[in-house]
Amino acid sequence: MTSLRALQLSCVLIICGVTMAASASETATGPEQGVWQKHEYSFQFLGFTTTYSCDGLASKLKVLLIAAGARADAKSTSGACSRGYGTPDKFARAYLKFYTLSAVGTADNASPPISGTWRSVALADRSPRELRLGDCELVEQFRDKVLPMFTTRNIDNRMTCVPNQLSGSVINLKFEVFAKFM
């Protein structure tokens, strides 16, 4: 009876060891080759809770682009707004021009390959520090419209945005992005 239990325990430990080694190899990958892909997008924000000026929207979007793994030279400029510079506008718009890293086999770009790696990203209230709970709907729209332009995996979306109120809203978006190896 004791030898049967010892055999069962040995089998369980071997299976656990193989499983742990397999999962560790999936998450701990070394540098891979990637190329920069250019993206240009006209982003129009439509939300209920927060109203941005066009320059304020452009500023928040640049923070989100860099946090999500865009190249450091990402540009976010204010679009044509009916109310002018610094004034909240219900239809704020920004123009985005940025580069994301794509795996060599998936990109149709002639730029020289560079080393990339998978990096964990977590967007939450005050992470990055410029992000506030009132930005919940903006993060939702960024997730839906801009994040698909990035090479991502393991997206964990636990966003809850309650229109017209901060109470009950939660910014919680986690994912892995293919970004420049540092």
Predicted feature locations:
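Bacterial N-terminal signal peptides that target proteins for export
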Residues: M1-C11
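Acidic/histidine-rich, surface-exposed loop or edge segments in extracytoplasmic proteins
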Residues: Q33-T49, G116-E130
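Short, intrinsically disordered low-complexity segments
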Residues: D73-G105, E176
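Glycine-rich, aromatic-bearing surface loops/beta-hairpins
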Residues: Q141-M182
